[in-house]
A protein has these predicted regions:
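Predominantly soluble domains enriched in secretory-pathway, periplasmic, or organellar proteins
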Residues: 1-243
Length: 243
C-alpha cells in the first residue's frame, strides 16, 4: 500500500491498495504525481492523486528496483536496483515511449544522488563499500572507488555540490567526503543504524535519521559537529523537505 498523509492534520487520509504490485519502496514527486518503485515486480509506477489512479507502469527489467529520483524537467527517471547491481537511466523518447539503460555499478547500489549541475549520478554500493560515478548524458560509468564503509545506506550531495554525505548503519557513522578529491573529511559517530539523510536548500545542516535510536541527528556542515538531536517515533528513516 501507499499512504497519503495530511501534513497539517498529521493523519492518514487515504491508503492506496497496490494489488499485485509488491514491496513498494522509493518515492518521488513530479508535476503533482507520485512515482514509486515495486521491488518484487521490477517496475516503477505513477499515481495521480487527483484521479486516485495508477496511470502508468514501466518495467525496469532489473532485480530489486529500490530507490527512485527524477530529473528536474521530468525527462529522465533514475533508479537503483540493489540485487541487479545496476543503476537505470530511463529517458523519454516520445509522448509515451521510454528507453531504459541499465549501467553496472558496485555491489548492492542503494543510496544515490544526482550532482546539483545534473551532470553526474553517484551511487553507494551497500555490499562492497564502493561509490560509482555515472556520466548521465553519455550513460556510462566514469569510475568506481572505495570509501571503506561497512554498509552504505544513503548518499547525498550538499546543494553547492562540494560535499558528499554517506550513512553507514552497520558502523554507526556518517561519512563526509570532499567531492573533488574523494577524500574523507570526517566520520561522525551517530549511534545505532544511521540511515536517511536530508539536507535543506540552504546547505547549513544535515539531518540524519538514526533508526536504532529513534532520533534525528543534526550536523553542522561548516564545523562537521553533531549539534542537536530530535526525538522521533520508532525507527525513523526516509525524510522529505516541505516548502
Amino acid at each position: 500500500t501507499i499512504s497519503v498523509i495530511d501534513l497539517v492534520a498529521q493523519k492518514e487520509i487515504h491508503r492506496l491498495d497496490l494489488g499485485t504490485l509488491r514491496r513498494p519502496h522509493g518515492l518521488a514527486v513530479f508535476d503533482g504525481k507520485l512515482y514509486f518503485t515495486c521491488e518484487v515486480n521490477k517496475i516503477i509506477g505513477r499515481y495521480d492523486p487527483a484521479t486516485n489512479q495508477i496511470d502508468w507502469l514501466l518495467g525496469t527489467g532489473q532485480d530489486q528496483t529500490h530507490m527512485i529520483e527524477l530529473s528536474r524537467d521530468g525527462s529522465q527517471i533514475y533508479t537503483a536496483n540493489i540485487a541487479g547491481n545496476t543503476i537505470s537511466i530511463i529517458g523519454r523518447t516520445g509522448e509515451a515511449n521510454w528507453l531504459v539503460t541499465s549501467i553496472p555499478v558496485g555491489k548492492g547500489p542503494e543510496g544515490f544522488d544526482v550532482t546539483p549541475d545534473g551532470k553526474e549520478l553517484w551511487a553507494a554500493g551497500s555490499r562492497d563499500g564502493s561509490v560509482s560515478e555515472i556520466d548521465i548524458a553519455n550513460k556510462r560509468l566514469i569510475r568506481t572507488f572505495n570509501v571503506q564503509t561497512k554498509r552504505s545506506n544513503r548518499l547525498r550531495f550538499t546543494p553547492d555540490g562540494r560535499l558528499v554525505l554517506i550513512s553507514d548503519p552497520d558502523a554507526g557513522d556518517l561519512l563526509i567526503l570532499d567531492r573533488e578529491t574523494r577524500k574523507d573529511l570526517k566520520r561522525i559517530k551517530l549511534g545505532s543504524q544511521p540511515a536517511g539523510i536530508l539536507i535543506p536548500p540552504d546547505g547549513a545542516r544535515a539531518y540524519v535519521a538514526v533508526t536504532g535510536d529513534n532520533n534525528i541527528a543534526v550536523i553542522d556542515l561548516k564545523t562537521f559537529d553533531l549539534v542537536d538531536r530530535i526525538s522521533t517515533g520508532q525507527n525513523p528513516d526516509g525524510m522529505a523537505w516541505v516548502k
